[in-house]
Design a protein with these regions (language model features):
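Short aromatic-centered micro-motifs
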Residues: 42, 81, 292
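Well-ordered mid-protein domain cores that form the structural environment of catalytic cofactors
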Residues: 49-50, 56-102
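Aromatic (often tryptophan-rich) hydrophobic motifs at membrane interfaces
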Residues: 228, 238-239, 254-263
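N-terminal low-complexity or simple alpha-helical regulatory segments
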Residues: 1-67, 72-73
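Short hydrophobic/aromatic patch on the recognition helix
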Residues: 239-243, 247, 291-292, 296
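Short, conserved glycine- and acidic-residue-centered signature motifs
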Residues: 64, 206, 256
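Alpha-helical bundle regulatory/interaction domains
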Residues: 1-34, 80-226, 230-236, 249-250, ...
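DNA major-groove recognition helix of helix-turn-helix
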Residues: 243, 251, 255, 296, ...
Length: 320
């Protein structure tokens, strides 16, 4: 059933939770200061549209759900996310096929748009409209005709604007169906030409190594770089090179920031009331209390003791 939700977030954990259905497996804030983000999500019968407005740099690890195509499109004149080390222009789209795993990062305030729909549905509509097979590469960058991209952006924006204004139009099944058909038609027009760039075998292999790095950190948050290198079967030099391209930083710093996030999450969970901040920090690999406190305050804008009593702020309005 069509519906929508617009949310404002004061903490990254709630923001991440809202993005899980879109395939966001992890979210790591890398910018300093208070977290602020706004997210509007629109669910139609056969697709989901969303737009996000973020104020701090972050790295997200995305796993596109099975039988799903994910489309990243530009919003306004703000820079969009960097996908797998690839920067996109305001005139470009990125598409990601079912099951693809990739890192996406921002380097400051960012606004982005996304479309998520069944890859089989898109292929069926594409065949019907073009009269030929409609198959997309696993990951590709597109530069549609200006008129086609303008039309897609218009329909995407119309759905988002309707949701944010809390209008009842999306609750009308005929209106929602008509909007969905317009978005699909405009999207197929944008993807009918050849992509300007598609992932090479080498790039796919490098991306897979970074996905395995995430798997390793999930099971062992603080592996040594020697251990990571041996497990992934690459040199430490190559690991650093891949991480800088995809993550915007070296593997050691990424690992430490993830550790800081785990500490913050533990402090906010309410399960650490009988533990000191230093005990929690040591449990997650931080041996120097003074350095930990300085780095924590620089990253989150508050001392760990304040985190113990701080509640994430979130407001949301829903319409169906």
């Amino acid at each position: 059933m069509p519906g929508s939700v617009t949310s404002v977030f004061g903490g990254p954990d709630d923001f991440h939770a809202a993005l899980r259905e879109d395939g966001v497996l992890s979210l790591l804030v890398t910018g300093n200061g208070p977290f602020r983000a706004r997210l509007t999500q629109v669910a139609l019968d056969h697709m989901h549209l969303s737009t996000g407005d973020e104020h701090l740099s972050r790295i997200a690890f995305v796993g596109v759900p099975a039988d799903t195509l994910l489309v990243s499109l530009p919003i306004g004149d703000r820079p969009g996310p960097i996908w797998g080390g690839v920067e996109t222009q305001a005139s470009e789209l990125m598409t990601f096929g079912p099951g693809q795993r990739i890192h996406t990062r921002t380097t400051g305030p960012c606004r982005w748009g996304a479309i998520r729909l069944s890859s089989e549905d898109l292929a069926e509509y594409g065949r019907a409209l073009s009269g030929a097979e409609f198959a997309l590469p696993p990951i590709a960058r597109w530069r549609p005709r200006r008129a086609a991209l303008r039309q897609l952006s218009h329909f995407h924006h119309a759905a988002i604007r309707t949701a944010e204004a809390r209008l009842a139009a999306l609750a009308n099944s005929q209106t929602a169906h008509g909007l969905e058909q317009q978005v699909i038609h405009a999207l197929i027009q944008c993807l009918s030409a050849r992509p300007v760039d598609q992932e090479t075998e080498a790039a796919s292999r490098y991306r897979g190594l970074l996905a395995r790095f995430e798997d390793l950190l999930l099971g062992e948050p603080f592996p040594s770089m020697d251990q990571v290198s041996v497990t992934l079967g690459i040199s430490k030099r190559m690991l650093r090179e891949y991480c800088r391209k995809h993550l915007g930083m070296g593997p050691d710093r990424y690992r430490r920031l993830r550790g800081m996030q785990l500490v913050r999450r533990a402090l906010r969970s309410g399960a650490e009331e009988t533990s000191s901040v230093c005990e929690v920090a040591r449990r997650y690999g931080y041996r120097d209390p003074r350095r930990f406190l300085v780095n924590y305050r620089a990253l989150y804008g508050e001392l760990p003791s304040a985190t113990l009593q701080r509640t994430p702020r979130r407001t949301a309005t829903r319409s169906k």
